[in-house]
Amino acid sequence: MNKDIATPIRTKEILNKYGFSFKKSLGQNFLIDTNILDRIVDHAGVTERTGVIEIGPGIGALTEQLAKRAKKVTAFEIDQRLLPILEDTLSPYDNVTVIHQDVLKADVRAVMDEQFQDCDEVMVVANLPYYVTTPIIMKLLEENLPLKGIVVMLQKEVADRMAAKPSSKEYGSLSIAVQFYTEAKTVMNVPKTVFVPQPNVDSAVIRLTLRKEPAVAVQDAAFFFQVVKASFAQRRKTLFNNLVNNLPNGKENKSKIERALQDSHIDGKRRGESLSIEEFAVLSDRLREVLL
């Protein structure tokens, strides 16, 4: 069997063989450290019972390590130029399928139904293209897919925001959106030096364990997220001002918003970043009652 893909020498050989040039627009940074890849697979808890969805396999460095341990790996690759490379580099593995499609446009549930019938669990494990990290993760969460969890490499700053706690400078609407659906934990930091080409930012691996039920029960999830988004619209403004200025018809309903805050025992002079997800749940339900 071939030597591991994820070494500097082998990666260079593969890229030279195919005359591959990186597309900045696709956020292509390939990992060249097998130890880090192994640790990612460890954090994902992949076993011979696991089906894995990978997004952006590149030349197959992570795919290869997943294929060694998983029952089945299905990878979404948007860049047509990588398809013949993947066919070559992953030829030793008969448990890998590559789908040439943008995962944001894919029917992921249908792919799961088709690919993973004989798997006990499904994980998403990926080194995500940084420019579409958040849309990809939110799509996977909002579609309520039967996933056990998501373990992905992403920009450290984004990982910090996803796992942030109230009253920290990283805490915001993304923290709440991710933690509504999952338990989020940053499991490792990754230096720039283990990629080609080197990215401009530091990276981290985050583990998102899917909750059986959302973190909080709310009457209307869409309205809950609307309230959260409004509360963080301008971080320096008070919660009351943000709600008035950013909720639909907020300015005409100042007194109702004030009443909802009082009923929820939340001081309108606080800032959105100081509220826990539980407080946002109470507030959004009360706002819904008085506004809708």
From Swiss-Prot:
It catalyses: adenosine(1518)/adenosine(1519) in 16S rRNA + 4 S-adenosyl-L-methionine = N(6)-dimethyladenosine(1518)/N(6)-dimethyladenosine(1519) in 16S rRNA + 4 S-adenosyl-L-homocysteine + 4 H(+). It is found in: Cytoplasm. The keyword Transferase applies. InterPro entries: KsgA/Erm, rRNA_Ade_diMease-like_C, rRNA_Ade_Mease_Trfase_CS, rRNA_Ade_methylase_Trfase_N, rRNA_adenine_dimethylase, SAM-dependent_MTases_sf. Its EC number is 2.1.1.182. Disulfide bonds: none annotated. Keywords: Cytoplasm, Methyltransferase, RNA-binding, rRNA processing, S-adenosyl-L-methionine, Transferase. Its main location: cytoplasm. HAMAP family: 16SrRNA_methyltr_A. Belongs to the class I-like SAM-binding methyltransferase superfamily. rRNA adenine N(6)-methyltransferase family. RsmA subfamily. This is Ribosomal RNA small subunit methyltransferase A. The gene is rsmA.
